[in-house]
Amino acid sequence: MSNVLKGKPVADKISEGLIQEVEVLKEKGITPKLAILRVGARGDDLAYEKGALSRCAKIGIDTEVKEFPEDITQEDFIEALRKTNGDPSIHGILIFRPLPKQLNEDVIKYEIAAEKDIDCLSPINAAKLLEGDDTGFPPCTPMAVIEILKHYEVQMEGKKAVVLGRSMVVGKPAALLLLKENATVTICHSRTKELSSVTKEGDILVAAIGKDRFVKEDFIKEGAVVIDVGINVDAEGNMYGDVDFEGCKEKAGMITPVPAGVGSVTTSILAKHVLKACRLQHNIY
């Protein structure tokens, strides 16, 4: 039986410091606030939103959810985003992705205010991530992956890390952050040939492909550390990851569960980024 890497101890440790930070800000008359912009009501978005709202409430961060219909026009969405950008009471903005087809993310990503873009949608923050510039905001989920590995004292330096998925939301940023920790990184995707033979080389496997229980036992190396980023919700509301947890837990050395794994840490990173944005906007360093 592998060592199950629960997210709660990691999230709680991060949150402890954030609670104290919020208290200091409130003494200065500043209340950090997060705005969530959600189009439609996808199950994985709602699950993440619920966790984010709960985490922010515990820490003392105000929140506002702006829900839009699935068929909202790009013009209307951009107008709402610009209003949110210009609201001085809002310090962080989270836009759930992927957006519906009528909303062009390649246009919208240039509209979000970089200083409020706490999940790395803006090309400015993406460039800072690539440069290793800590003044930006890396995506929350890949940062949660790194925090889990550090918390459980998993050595990254010199290890082979395989990232399954190449999105700008998780896959590519996770690879860059692992590279920053001096891991040797391979990115796999839908066109990778002999996929399982590549993933089996990883001392660390990060699954971020967005397919319910896609990663089976034959995908992983004996004793590997498996980090499951997936959130997949079925018709009955049951949540599963991208990894077949039951099938892989005996072979893996360490493995994160879904739920109660990466997601809970992601919300703490989100809160951390809201506070960072708030401090920067108020010139508190």
Curated annotation (Swiss-Prot):
Residues that coordinate or bind NADP(+): 165-167, 190, 231
Keyword Oxidoreductase carried by entry: yes
Pfam families, per the entry: THF_DHG_CYH, THF_DHG_CYH_C
Coiled-coil positions: none
Pathway participation: One-carbon metabolism; tetrahydrofolate interconversion
EC identifiers of the protein: 1.5.1.5, 3.5.4.9
Gene Ontology cellular component terms for the protein in this record: cytosol
SUPFAM superfamilies: Aminoacid dehydrogenase-like, N-terminal domain, NAD(P)-binding Rossmann-fold domains
Extent of the signal sequence: none
One Gene Ontology biological process: L-histidine biosynthetic process
Subunit text: Homodimer.
Purpose of the protein: Catalyzes the oxidation of 5,10-methylenetetrahydrofolate to 5,10-methenyltetrahydrofolate and then the hydrolysis of 5,10-methenyltetrahydrofolate to 10-formyltetrahydrofolate.
Family to which this protein belongs: Belongs to the tetrahydrofolate dehydrogenase/cyclohydrolase family.
Protein's name according to its UniProt entry: Bifunctional protein FolD
Organism: Alkaliphilus oremlandii (strain OhILAs)
Classification lineage: Bacteria, Bacillati, Bacillota, Clostridia, Peptostreptococcales
